[in-house]
Amino acid sequence: MTIRFYDHSIVKQAKSIALLDLGAMDNFMNLAYAKWLCLLIKQLENPRPLYNIDGTENKSRRLKYYTDLEVWTGTVNTTLWFFLSDLREHKAILGYPCFAATQP
């Protein structure tokens, strides 16, 4: 399932499609897309191994970067981590933490 979302950074605004995945234990954003939006990219102290949904190793191999994003659902907002990696055609994957925080 997908959902339309809107990105607002200091430099750019964009409308995109995110993949909804309750099985994903974290939120993810495409690294190239985060760079295009000029988001503040932070480096993880301890990179983590990264696997695709089908269990194969991701092309990026390890999660090295993340960004903090303010997520709005109606009038409620919360700040969530988004790990940054190569997501191929997807701009973002909203996982369990997003659902738990926003309870859409």
What name fits each language-model region?
Residues M1-R4, I10-P104:
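Aspartic protease
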